[in-house]
A protein has these predicted regions:
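Mature catalytic core of soluble alpha/beta enzymes
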Residues: 1-209
Length: 209
């Protein structure tokens, strides 16, 4: 379940029977150990930085900008992942995952990272008519169908955009309260049934309830 070398959507035969931890696919539990900020693996592993790679690139660009001029004002927009350092707040539309031409809300931010995640631009239908996308639940290996879009605002001292990027993806499978116990961030979530929720200090609002 994924993409081929031409970046077109493909499924291997019987993919549903071979994906996810419940079907015997390897998980991190027995493959790694955490020692503070050090990750130790017990064998060869493949690391996919797709969940935070674009955000990390934004942070690297910001680091160079800051090194060149510490008081520089800027907005780095990597298409859904932004890092903002401005004197006045900028307004950001929360894109409707069902219709990219419309917004479901707005946010305002002047300092920090603001990242969104949604399968609206990466989805396809298999031969059996199943709707598939790239945001998978590691437990069963199939696309998450309960969440339509997420937005995260974060202002940690370093790697703000990488963190916000990863958290926006993690919200598809992990409750916000569980993530907020480990990371400082604000978020908004739009579910598949068009229900909207947001954390108390999220810097924006939805047009619907």
């Amino acid at each position: 379940l994924g993409y081929d070398k031409s970046y077109s959507s493909v499924n291997e035969p019987n993919a549903a029977e071979h994906t996810g931890a419940i079907h015997g696919r390897a998980t991190w539990d027995h493959a790694i150990e955490h020692h503070g900020t050090t990750l130790v693996t017990h064998g060869p592993v493949a690391l996919d930085f797709g969940a935070c790679g674009k955000g990390y690139l934004v942070d690297l660009i910001a680091e160079r900008l800051g090194a060149a001029q510490s008081d520089l004002r800027y907005v780095i927009d990597a298409g859904g992942d932004l890092l903002v350092h401005t004197s006045e707040p900028i307004t950001i539309a929360l894109e409707d995952p069902s219709d990219p031409a419309n917004a479901v809300g707005v946010a305002e931010i002047s300092q920090g990272a603001f990242c969104a995640s949604s399968p609206s631009r990466r989805h396809w239908t298999d031969a059996a008519g199943h709707q598939l996308h790239h945001l998978l639940n590691a437990i069963d290996g199939v696309p998450v169908n309960s969440v339509a879009a997420t937005w995260v605002a974060a202002t940690p001292p370093s790697l703000a955009t990488a963190q916000a990027d990863g958290l926006a993806t993690a919200l598809f499978t992990t409750p916000a309260a569980q993530l907020r116990a480990h990371f400082p961030f604000e978020c908004a979530i739009l579910t598949a049934d068009r229900s909207a929720a947001q954390s108390p200090d999220f810097p924006g609002s939805f047009f619907m309830r």
